[in-house]
UniProtKB/Swiss-Prot annotation:
PANTHER family reported for this sequence: POLYRIBONUCLEOTIDE NUCLEOTIDYLTRANSFERASE, POLYRIBONUCLEOTIDE NUCLEOTIDYLTRANSFERASE 1, MITOCHONDRIAL
Gene name of this polypeptide: pnp
Protein name, per record: Polyribonucleotide nucleotidyltransferase
Cofactors, names only: Mg(2+)
Annotated Gly residues bias: 723-734, 775-815
Gene3D superfamilies referenced in this protein's UniProt entry, alphabetically: GHMP Kinase, N-terminal domain, K Homology domain, type 1, Nucleic acid-binding proteins
UniProt main location, coarse: cytoplasm
GO biological process, one term: mRNA catabolic process
Record CDD domains: KH-I_PNPase, RNase_PH_PNPase_1, RNase_PH_PNPase_2, S1_PNPase
Domain S1 motif: 625-692
Amino acid sequence: MKPEPKVATVEFTGGKSLSFETGKLAKQAHGSAIVRSGQSVVLATACANADPREGIDFFPLTVDYREYTYAGGRFPGGFIKREGRPSEKEILTSRQIDRPIRPLFPEGFRCETQVIAMVLSADSENDPDVCGINGASAALAVSDIPFNGPIGAVRVGLIEGQNIVNPTYDEMRASKLNIMVVGTAEGIVMIESGAHEATEEEVVSAIEFGHGEIKKICAVISKLAKEVGKTKRTVAPVELDQPYLDGLRKKIGADLADALNTEKYPKSESYAKVKEIKSKLKEEIPADDDAALKKLGKYYELLREDIFRQQVTKEKRRPDGRAFDQIRQIWIEVDVLPRTHGSAVFTRGETQALVTTTLGTGDDMQRMEGFEGEAKKRFMLHYNFPPFSVGEVAFLRGAGRREIGHGALAERALSAVLPSEDKWPYAMRVVSDILESNGSSSMASICGGSLSLMDAGVPLKAPVAGIAMGLVKEGDDYAILTDIAGAEDHYGDMDFKVAGTTQGITALQMDIKIGGITAQIMREALEQARRGRLFILDKMNEVIQSPRTELSEFAPRFYTLQIPTDKIRDLIGPGGKVIRGIVEATGVKIDVEDSGKVNVASSDQEAAKKALKMIGDITATAEVGKTYLGTVTRLADFGAFVEILPGTDGLLHISEVAEHRIKDVKDELHEGDQVLVKVLAVDGNRIKLSRKAVLKEQRAKMATEGGGDGGPAPEVEHSEHGAPGGVTFEGGYEGGDEPEVEEGEPNFNRDDAPGSHGATQPHSGGDRPDRGPRPHGGGGGAGRGGRGRRPGGGGGGGRGGHGGRGGGGGGRGRG
């Protein structure tokens, strides 16, 4: 019998909705829920092992979010038509689900737990990541897994001053703010945001608006769990052996507090002292007493945390002696590596990032595939955290989820100030290698990334700095900490990262380890972060105030031209043969867009000019009124076909071959001859040419100048392929524009013509052997004897006639 699912719907401000359904699919999972937003559908499941995992002191939670291409009605690309490893988007969304739910499991719960969210259907309007977070919350709520939820998640946009809940893709592109807010009915537990220099008040207003919508989600999930949810498992409360902790404090409390004083000891020395104290305590315990050793480890860590929290909340003192709003010492250097396109070292306290920028072309952009199709990404920021940065030994493997998450945050912070692609067509890759770490390494990556991009000459709208804020809260008493170090991050209640310019916020990330925080605490934290951000920006401006005006000599230069869209095929050639030939001949990179925009990139200026000229020759179009040096490709009874541009033929009708009437085209022309022709008309792909018009113009010109030896005729620029040299394109390039061809001034001086024969010259007399000389020149025939290269024309040496003294006689001189 078909099961009847339980369905509940949330109605949001603005008319959008989110529906939850349970009891129909994946019923053997301990908890499952279907979440719908528009036509986007996500299935979320939750399962936990019955028995706790032995020998661990952490909660073994795994979260996986997957976007299958079938959700968008697509096949996976490539040879293997099956989804493979998770994409970056899937990993980041998995983290967005993990981070808010992890603190809400009861302390002491050690059963392996797995949450899986699968995108089953995806429309082109609604991002399913919101459904994934809400689905995970609903699946846990209706399961028997102990969970102190539910949570709700909404994305908030800001368009023309109005907050919008769960904006569509189109709305997000127009939004000043893109903020994911996750919380319980009581408070906010996670924030993930990108923004275009939003103010602190705009951010807080969006968060408060989002929390109002979250309360609606939590109410619906709670009602659903109450109606169809399973009975929760019982978890034995963690008992605190207070006498044991007090005894440990009395015995080593003072020594441990001294060892944790990083104002007195550097981080490495402090950690060594802390480890030494613990080792001495272990020596007092029998080696085979595992229970006692385990208990010592647990309470030793509790004592460390308690000492830290008491120092901050009661003594108003940080471990390194700084004031709550004080930033560690900063030193900065740019242009540190000779061959990179841009580089910077940003050091803040014991955290150091070496950040490099590499500029590339369209071919270097990241190609991404998802259910919505394929896309390109021109800006990438990759964050690396080698083990030596914290003095440890470990295998070097691929980037983990933490590294991907930190890189994405820094990337989002800098994306807001990048120039638009039409003004800056480069692909950009920023790599942050953390060389030292004691907290806030992702924020050091943002600062170093901004410096590195400016060192590379990327015209950023403004420099960006990032700062990490912390919170220690005991009851109503709390302290907000600026520029938190590693211990403050580990033992504190909040990790609040804020990045931005002098004008506003570009990225935000907040994780809360407690039940939630109030809007007032958030306002104070944002204001304190703003002051810290401005301080860091001042330090950065002391080193480099604006992007460099000159690119590195090793960076590629972009040259752009616009070609007709119907010429794209000619440029690419069959199987890419033509464009590959240009690349192989010049070493440049070429990117052709569907609009006809061609980007040529090379660090060698001469190679780029050569490639541009080759492209211009291949894609040039015939212009009415212009004269071209063409090659006869085929003869017919009614005329000749002349290639005036590569791949472009025009018809030279028999009536336009000469000024006099001819009976047979072969009397004047042969295949392979080069002739000067003028374009009379262009009708689609049909081009009408005239040689007669060129001859008339030349004769008139010579007559005006007094006939005879009127001096050498001016040369006409031409390309290697016979097309006019130089190209005209959007923006221009140093090769210059196409020279205008003056009427009556064709080029008679072509030395590199195929077959080593001269250009066909205009006639003053006839081509017949019996024709005598006329004014301005003899009537040499279509002779094959001499080259006829005298200034002003020169005789061709005919079959029976003779060339005039200064005339333009001579037909096909083929000497």
